[in-house]
Amino acid sequence: MPRLRLAVLLLVSTFAAACATMEPPRIQVERLGRPQMGLTGATLEVTFNVRNPNDYPVTIDRVRYDLFLNGVRVGDGFITQRVDVEPFGEARMSSRFDLNYLRVPGAVRSIMERDRVDARTRGRFYMRRSGGRERRVNFSSEANLDFDRGPRP
């Protein structure tokens, strides 16, 4: 009988620990702002949607990501603004992204002239629960997006 109690106790504690694990938020590139073209490059705003699948709030402290447009890596971006995401909630994070024509000659300009683009991001974000330790999580996302070109005449 003592072995059965020990087995049940072990099973219950394992189940409780599994329920208490943190599921990482899901980050998806949601929007590419209207490109601001310059002589040596372009600037655009990249907006991400963050979903928290947990029943407690989480904080995203920072994000580092690589951006690929139509299969071409055009650079890396950073988000340093902290974002709190409510339980089962969503939040938005944005980053100003600088594209250098010299880095990927010809490709960037041809991508920027299109209305629609395949956008892929991969990177890592740093998150934590309230009062908890920071945790590093890798992510990747893909989307087919229109550039936000603002109002059309």
Question: Over which residues does each language-model region extend?
Answer:
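Intrinsically disordered, low-complexity Pro/Gly/Ser/Thr-rich segments with frequent PxxP/GP/PP motifs
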Residues: 69-105
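Outer-membrane beta-barrel proteins
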Residues: 34-36, 55, 81-83, 109-111
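A short, structured loop/turn motif at beta-sheet edges
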Residues: 53, 85-91, 115, 130
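Bacterial N-terminal signal peptides that target proteins for export
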Residues: 1-8
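Post-signal-peptide N-terminal segment of Sec-exported extracytoplasmic proteins
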Residues: 26-30, 35-76, 127-129, 133-138
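Intrinsic-disorder/low-complexity, polar/charged segments enriched in Ser/Thr/Lys/Arg/Asp/Glu/Gln
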Residues: 41-45, 90-94, 118-120, 138-140
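N-terminal Sec signal peptide cleavage junction
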Residues: 18-19
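Terminal connector regions
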Residues: 101-153
